[in-house]
Regions:
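Alpha-solenoid helical-repeat scaffolds
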Residues: 65-69, 120, 312-315
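N-terminal accessory targeting/assembly segments
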Residues: 1-81, 85
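Globular "head" domains of long coiled-coil molecular machines
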Residues: 4-22, 155-400, 418-424, 428-433
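Short loop/turn motifs at secondary-structure boundaries
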Residues: 404-415
Length: 435
């Protein structure tokens, strides 16, 4: 059975593919053989989009003359060319590419069996080294080292699909900073941030095993190379799925799905709260990330929603993220006292030992964008510098509210500020899997 989530979350980086610098004629042959083996096993939107990715990388805008009638001869020429020994590498690369695109053991094995029909027994024996190496990282690949880069990509995708997926569902009242927090955790601006409600349906954000500079988007249509414009113009009339590599302060090896739900207090559309409640009761997840706006605590809608969660869901699954504490003024507001008061209120509502994580989601996002090489606007640069100055004051050091998060002398600016604004602790708790 085909697991479409695996296909949706696979990473493939073709920037160093060994065929990029080959002659056009040879690349055409290679592509046609790859296309033949892939489509014979699985012909759907995911495999077709991958073939387009290869085509664009190999040829840019050059059109390929289809030669399907000659495909058997082309396969034989590439896979079993006895008089051109330098071509022996191609069958290994093709097999790796097929494996990366299909990500299914049964289909990969079927492809391997067909490819072997074009090989001598000696070639088949050597080819088995690759097939075993794709399944076992301990296999010696010194004799096929030329395929190491593609094998490494497949192995990492295989590792990723075999580990448990951790699902976290995010809920909040409008203007709590939900999209900003999610973007900060993901490490890139995938979700639109606005004071007005954007999310009127569910959005599933999946991480990928490694960075391949591609964002997968399933909305009305599917693309494995979504642009910023595509992400801005998402239709919230249907469920949305996005897959991208999550850029953490440290490398993220966990398999994560973050479920974004509609804001629950949008008066112009009463169904938003109902959608959130239904998904909270029906979806499987490990933790609920409930975002509180530190500037709007104690509203009737907030209290009613928290009571509903306390009465209908597992209270042990809830993590409270207290956002926008950076907007407090030290001369008038006491952050420590505010956090304690929130804790007391939550205990009264039935949350016996609430986990409260203070954070500045917007500063966290600026930190991630700067760390990951995004070009900040002049205003964002000014804001970043302002936050640096603010969070160097001891009153705004949120690291003390997280277990096992300590400032160290060797911390660079990014790490220091991520600890102080709460990002580092929350990220370790969620994406590091230490809840």
């Amino acid at each position: 059975m085909i697991d479409e989530t695996v296909l949706f979350t696979t990473s493939i980086d073709l920037s160093n593919h060994p065929m990029i610098n080959a002659k056009i004629k040879l690349k055409k042959q290679y592509y046609l053989v790859l296309k033949y083996f892939v489509k014979k096993q699985l012909d759907n939107k995911y495999t077709n989009s991958r073939l387009i990715q290869y085509k664009e990388k190999f040829f840019n805008r050059i059109e390929i003359m289809e030669e399907e009638s000659q495909i058997k001869n082309i396969i034989k020429a590439l896979i079993n060319s006895r008089f051109k020994p330098w071509k022996k590498k191609y069958k290994y690369w093709i097999m790796c590419d097929v494996a990366l695109i299909l990500m299914n053991d049964e289909l990969i094995d079927k492809t391997a069996l067909e490819m072997k029909k074009y090989m001598s027994q000696r070639q088949q024996k050597q080819f088995d080294i690759l097939l075993n190496a794709l399944k076992d990282n301990n296999v010696d690949i010194s004799s096929i080292i030329f395929a190491e880069e593609l094998m490494t990509q497949y192995r990492e995708n295989r590792r990723f699909k075999e580990i448990k997926m951790h699902k976290y569902i995010v809920t909040a009242n409008m203007s709590a900073g939900k999209s900003t927090l999610i973007n900060a955790l993901v490490g890139k601006p995938l979700l639109k941030m606005s004071q007005e409600v954007c999310t009127s349906n569910l959005c599933y954000l999946y991480n990928k095993p490694y960075e391949d500079e591609r964002v997968h988007l399933q909305n009305i249509d599917f693309t494995n190379n979504a642009t910023e414009k595509d992400l801005r113009n998402i239709s919230w009339k249907t469920k949305t799925s996005i897959a991208s590599y999550f850029r953490g302060i440290d490398d993220i090896k966990s398999h994560i799905c973050i479920i974004d739900t509609p804001g629950v207090n949008y008066v112009l559309n009463q169904k938003h709260g109902k959608i959130s409640q239904e998904i909270l009761q029906q979806e499987e997840y490990e933790k609920i990330i409930y975002i509180l706006n530190a500037n709007k605590l104690g509203t009737d809608e907030e209290i009613n929603y928290l009571k509903w969660i306390s009465e209908n869901l597992s209270k042990e699954k809830v993590i409270f993220v207290l956002n926008k504490l950076d907007e407090f003024r030290i001369a008038y507001d006491d952050i420590f006292m505010s956090i304690n008061n929130v804790k007391k209120d939550l205990i009264i509502m039935g949350f016996e030992n609430p986990v409260i994580c203070p954070i500045s989601a917007y500063f966290a996002l600026l930190i991630k964008m700067k760390a990951n090489g995004y070009e900040l606007t002049d205003d964002e640069i000014d804001e970043y510098l302002f936050y640096i100055k603010k969070f160097r004051k001891k009153e705004y050091d949120f690291s003390k509210y997280y277990q096992s998060v300590y400032l160290e002398d060797g911390d660079n600016e990014i790490v220091e500020m991520s600890k102080k604004c709460g990002l580092y602790g929350l990220e370790k708790m969620l994406l590091g899997g230490i809840i």
